[in-house]
Amino acid sequence: MKKLIIIFTILFSVNAVFGQSLKSVKLDSLVNVSLPSSYTKKDTLGQQVYTANSDLGYMIAIRQANEKGNQPLQKENDLNAVLKKYIDGIQSQSGNGSAQNIRDTTIGTLKAKAFTLFQNDPNGESQYRNFILLYTQDATYTFEYGYGDSRKDLIKGESKAYFASIKLSRELQRNDQYVDTRPQTSNSKVTVIEITGGILIIGLIAWLIFRKKDSGQFA
């Protein structure tokens, strides 16, 4: 029991220190994220990389300017395709990494993708890297929280706090990601509508035929 109390005390202290040392960092005029105050920044060829370490893991935030003259994405499917390409690229660059639990999420009014990259190391400690990818017309943002397998049960609060600290300007809206923001009708709904319409048309034709026959009998 005493050991449990000591462990919980240590964890509480670590989280408290982490929370107190967080600093809001502007990636640009539209996107902010909170990092430990000891973060470092590298700026090369239109890419800004912010890195920081905590007692449990590490954080990386990247702003990559998109190519000038980049054509606007038209629909949500186009956005999903772009984000999938980024995920495939991260997985490929990791060597033996496996992208897991890929899912949709939202930050403010924008759509994003979240996933975990698992890197197995049979000779050492396997690594986990949690990601959120955010795409806009002007820039792509990558947020990462990495940690070792031995700490996967300890980092949940810290990882959650890091990703929850991502803040967007109100100027950023869904049409900064793709042009046609109307809700997309699923294929199943379209199929049901088409089938229902077909049945109604067939029924109407049958009714007209029988009505014509009945009229002929009583003529």
Where are these regions (language model features)?
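N-terminal "mature-domain start" segment
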Residues: 20-47
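Surface-exposed amphipathic alpha-helical segments
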Residues: 28-30, 37-39, 141-183
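Sec/Tat signal peptide C-region and signal peptidase I cleavage site
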Residues: 15-19
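Conserved polar/disulfide-associated segments of primarily extracytoplasmic proteins
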Residues: 46-129, 133-135, 141-142, 147
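Soluble, non-membrane globular domain cores that form compact, hydrophobic packing
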Residues: 13, 154-158, 212-219
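Sec-dependent N-terminal signal peptides
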Residues: 4-14
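C-terminal single-pass membrane-anchor helix
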Residues: 177-219
